[in-house]
From Swiss-Prot:
Residues 20-168 form the PX domain. This is Sorting nexin-32. Keywords: Coiled coil, Protein transport, Transport. The keyword Protein transport applies.
Amino acid sequence: METYAEVGKEGKPSCASVDLQGDSSLQVEISDAVSERDKVKFTVQTKSCLPHFAQTEFSVVRQHEEFIWLHDAYVENEEYAGLIIPPAPPRPDFEASREKLQKLGEGDSSVTREEFAKMKQELEAEYLAIFKKTVAMHEVFLQRLAAHPTLRRDHNFFVFLEYGQDLSVRGKNRKELLGGFLRNIVKSADEALITGMSGLKEVDDFFEHERTFLLEYHTRIRDACLRADRVMRAHKCLADDYIPISAALSSLGTQEVNQLRTSFLKLAELFERLRKLEGRVASDEDLKLSDMLRYYMRDSQAAKDLLYRRLRALADYENANKALDKARTRNREVRPAESHQQLCCQRFERLSDSAKQELMDFKSRRVSSFRKNLIELAELELKHAKASTLILRNTLVALKGEP
């Protein structure tokens, strides 16, 4: 397996198909990417007329860890607590494809040279598809930030886009990964405590509906993603199964007498063409359906995180009200309690205002994306079904027409 791969503008799939309606004053894209063993280097190109930047067009080279650093910087910034932070791109993972190629290279005496070449071609195509999707997901993350009227003004985002040197960001060690896992557990427990034992009542029907909807939506999206992956893998397995069938028929075509030779060769060609068609079906389903579901599973989690932050702010506001009542009853430290209550109130109202707009934008974005991807997938599957029918019909006609 080659440890070096490169993709340019023409080679990127629109695997998430996120609808980005930002203005043209800040345009970001990944113009090139190179894979070197376990690292992928992305060339991030920026075009902007914003006064903050010294130039109107520039590019930098970034690695995955720097994308994660940027995402974490947004999540940890209190100013963005009322916003849906775009989900971080997944870590590049080519290990499975490399292991398959390594096993194939170790050799199997039962595999013919023709079968080996076809299987190697399939695995290399799979590796390239994963690489292109990795690039596309990193690009979508940056474009979501660039299109957002608030997130695009972040200082760290400017540094990420413009600073020409390495950002000296390292990957998280095991202790930090464990810490993040424990924080998620604490957050889940805190949310359950707020909504359950404390008996906190939601004061806005809009957010109560959104919370109920997102809990169900996230579960359904996750289940649909698992099912879509199973269907896609079934198509891939079918395409792989056609390889030995085609090879066996081709071998028979070279051994039999003239009367059967033509039939075997035509059948071998049939299964080879069906193999390529099934491969395209699997690729389209992976790109248009599985990847979209996987992306919105992460995006819906980001929306759930936003609702948790607002719920936490509401709980803090309620606790501040109780503390103020106690202070007034005791007639002690009333002014600090009033000041704290006002701050909690302002934070809760600020988060509520921005969260409502963010959730409405999330709805329109996902509806547009689902409509676009599902229509395109249906059109592609109709095209492939017609092509498959035509191949079978032409093969039958050719076989019947033989002397």
